[in-house]
Structures are given as C-alpha cells and as structure tokens.
Amino acid sequence: MKILRKNHPLLKIINHSFIDLPTPSNISSWWNFGSLLALCLAIQILTGLFLAMHYTSDTTTAFSSVAHICRDVNYGWLIRYLHANGASMFFICLFIHVGRGIYYGSYVLSETWNIGIILFLTTMATAFVGYVLPWGQMSFWGATVITNLLSAIPYIGNTLVEWIWGGFSVDKATLTRFFAFHFILPFIIAAFVLVHLLFLHETGSNNPSGLNSDSDKIPFHPYYTIKDLLGVFLLLLALMTLALFFPDVLGDPDNFTPANPLNTPAHXXPEWYFLFAYAILRSIPNKLGGVLALVLSILILAAFPLLNTSKQHGLIFRPITQIIFWIFIANLLLLTWIGGQPVEYPFTAIGQIASITYFIIIIILMPVSNTIENNIIKL
C-alpha cells in the first residue's frame, strides 16, 4: 500500500498533499480552519444538491417550494437548516482563517493570499445570490437594493443593472439566473481551492513563530489529520446545535413573508456576515463613493503584502502591531453591529468613524508600527 500511494499517478498527488506533506511541527489550532472550510464547502455542496432537487426557480412557486421542502420532503427541514446555518459557519471559519493570515503574516505568500481573496469574493457572491432564492421579503429587497448599487457606475451603470435583472425590475429572469449562478459558483470555488492549495504547497505553510521551520518538519498524517478531526467534530457539534435548536436565530423574520414588490420592509439588512461591508457602504452619503468603499473593504486585503515592511514574520514578537490588530478586530465587530442598526443618529456617526478607522488601521497605522518596530530592533 505504501509503495502504491507513492508511485500511483493519482494517489501520489494525494500522498504529497495530505499524507507525507512536510508540515511545521508547531502550527496551532488556528491552522485548523483551512480544513474546516473544505468541510463547510462539502456540506454546502451536498445539502445544496438535495435542495436543488426540490426547489423551483420561478417567482410564483419559489417560496412555496421552500415551504414544501420543509414540510413534505424527508428531513427536508434539516437539509434546509443545515444549508442556511452552514453558510454562517462557513463565514465564521472564513473570517477566522483570514484573521489568522493577517496575525501570523501569511500574506507574505502572495500567490496563496491573492487566490484567497478571490475565494473570499466568490464565496460572498455565492452567499448573496443564494439569499435571494427563498423569495421572501428580505430576499427580494436585498436583491433589489444590492444590484441597484451597480447603477452608480458611470455611463454603463443603468444598462448593467437591467442586464443583470433580465428586465426592468427584479423578477422571474433574475431569480432563474441567480439560481444558475448559485449552483455553479460552489464548483468554481472548489477549483480555486485546489489552486490555493497548489500555491500553498509550493512554498510550504507558515508557522506561529514566524521563523524558518525547514529543520523541524513532521508528516501531515497522522499528526495533523487527527488534530483536524477534533476541529471537524467541534464544527459539526456547533452546526448541529444551530440547525436543531436555534435554526432561525441568524435569519431574518421578514423572509417568512413572500416577496411583495409593493411593500418595502422597515429596515432592509443583509445577512450578518455582510453587515460590516454594509455599514461601510451606508457610512458614505454619495452612492458611487459608498460602492467604491464597499469594494475596497474587501480588496484592501490585497494591500497587506504590499504595505508590509516588517523585518519579522507575523505579530508574535510585535506588541505594538498586536494592539493595533486587536483594535482592528474590535472595529470590525463594531461595524457588524452598526450594519444591523437603523439609519439614524448616533448609529450613522459611529458607522462613519468605524469605517474611517477600518481603512486608517490598514493603510497607515500598521505600516507605521512596522517601521517603529524595525527601528526598535536596531537599538
């Protein structure tokens, strides 16, 4: 078996990626989230496939088809809630994975990091089009509000919006194409994941100390397969607890009402994992400015490798940047809270301050602290 896995053309690839892969001996539990994201993607594709068997992408029957899945399909309610809450678990793991990358300086592996940003954007797009499919009130108005933002693009904006809608409003054509996008995008994500892993295994993984670990490597299996299994069980425990005990806690009550183009909800708000970006969008009074800030709030992650001037890898021995990093996390949580609040004082003012702080930390404070710490080392 050992000879087969090392010589067989297909098994050899799996062997070099998951069995005999030389891995730093000191990587912590923060490195578990990559495998957990792969698990989340597998759960989402599997549950999504079963949901697609019973769902109809037509404005007249979409809402009732979701109700039919929950009421009449064997364990349909479980599949639906695993899929809905699986998306939340996916984004929790994604945020932690990106946060770990920032904290431990994984962005220096620029190819892996940039593919990761593409994965992040693709996952956000998938979640957005998926949220429209149940055709509830918040689904409909979320689709209307967010797609309408494209009209801020000069010259081609209005044409682009009508092209995406497939008409002059969000209607049957929009729902059909969103279902098509939602079905195909996870497979595109899976392809990008393979590219992400390919680039990662070209350079080898980073480690918590930020030091070169070439002299201290251990095989991935059995050490990290067992360690990843613990993460898998904890994730499944959290997901099953959410799906079985609190299935609707992260959803919006407005989505229990069928979509009505003549009745606007009191507060149109996206899913919780988009609230930080939504708060940044709302904090700028100008429409085009808001859209640019929204896009930049994600694309600014690509600036980390460019703005990094530190002589050290990661933040483990850098107390000043550590403090700035945790202020950044607190600011992100504040933006998430603000995104769910109504557009009125003092929430708008707090949102504007937090949005400015978000960009200042990444563009100014972190590079400045890098320079200060470099000078301290020289002393």
From Swiss-Prot:
Heme b b562 binds at residues 83, 182. It is found in: Mitochondrion inner membrane. The cytochrome bc1 complex contains 11 subunits: 3 respiratory subunits (MT-CYB, CYC1 and UQCRFS1), 2 core proteins (UQCRC1 and UQCRC2) and 6 low-molecular weight proteins (UQCRH/QCR6, UQCRB/QCR7, UQCRQ/QCR8, UQCR10/QCR9, UQCR11/QCR10 and a cleavage product of UQCRFS1). This cytochrome bc1 complex then forms a dimer. Binds 2 heme b groups non-covalently. One of its GO terms (biological process) is mitochondrial electron transport, ubiquinol to cytochrome c. It comes from Akodon serrensis (Serrado Mar grass mouse). This is Cytochrome b. GO terms for cellular component: mitochondrial inner membrane; respiratory chain complex III. Its cofactor is heme b. It comes from the Eukaryota. The chain crosses the membrane at residues 33-53, 77-98, 113-133, 178-198, 226-246, 288-308, 320-340, 347-367. The lineage of its organism: Eukaryota, Metazoa, Chordata, Craniata, Vertebrata. A ubiquinone binds at residue 201. Keywords: Electron transport, Heme, Iron, Membrane, Metal-binding, Mitochondrion, Mitochondrion inner membrane, Respiratory chain, Transmembrane, Transmembrane helix, Transport, Ubiquinone. Belongs to the cytochrome b family. Component of the ubiquinol-cytochrome c reductase complex (complex III or cytochrome b-c1 complex) that is part of the mitochondrial respiratory chain. The b-c1 complex mediates electron transfer from ubiquinol to cytochrome c. Contributes to the generation of a proton gradient across the mitochondrial membrane that is then used for ATP synthesis. Heme 1 (or BL or b562) is low-potential and absorbs at about 562 nm, and heme 2 (or BH or b566) is high-potential and absorbs at about 566 nm. One of its GO terms (molecular function) is ubiquinol-cytochrome-c reductase activity. Its main location: mitochondrion. It is a multi-pass membrane protein. Pfam families: Cytochrom_B_C, Cytochrome_B. Changing residue 108 to I: In strain: Isolate LG VA1. Heme b b566 binds at residues 97, 196.
